[in-house]
Amino acid sequence: MLAYTYEENGKFVLKEKEKPTLQSEDDAIVRVTLASICSSDLHIKHGAVPRAVPGITVGHEMVGIVEETGRRVTKVKPGDRVTVNVETFCGECFFCKNGFVNNCTDQNGGWALGCRIDGGQAEYVRVPYAEQGLNKIPDSVTDEAALFVGDVLATGFLGGADFRDRRRGYGRHYRRRTYGNLYAFVRDA
């Protein structure tokens, strides 16, 4: 399959790679139907992300169709259209249990896709922790509209949220809700 790959500082290359396979019962393989380039991908290209691994396929903003799932994946099945969350997470470590999935301590957790493990600028992508990392796309939503859910909308929303009083749980007037990788803050009445 073709994959857009981070070769070295300053260099991305479109090259042939093997189609990914399941490595865990928690994985899914997704056929990518649409992906976008994020400024974070460009930061990798220009050496501003030291943890990025040369040789990985870049990309963490994508939608696609589930091709295969591991035994423990139950929320999606082959044939489902899905968004892929920017961050994969185990759901078990201290950070995941406290809502800070970007700091997941698992080797495949946090910002792994397209940084430390192969991402979605390819024909196929392996998604670790697919149970938490994939969200079904309703039939009424286009791939183009759904593409923004995994990173752009969530990042923008969180960036604009009121974090004045972080020590008391994101402000005393707000309750946090998590839906996959989409976060919502609800103002108490």
Q: In which residue ranges do the predicted regions lie?
A:
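Cytochrome P450 core scaffold surrounding the K-helix E-X-X-R motif
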Residues: S40-H46
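Short Gly/Pro-enriched turn/cap motifs at secondary-structure boundaries
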Residues: E7, K19-P20, V53-G59, L113-D118, ...
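Mid-domain Rossmann-like dinucleotide-binding core that forms the NAD(H)/NADP(H) cofactor-binding site
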Residues: D139-A189
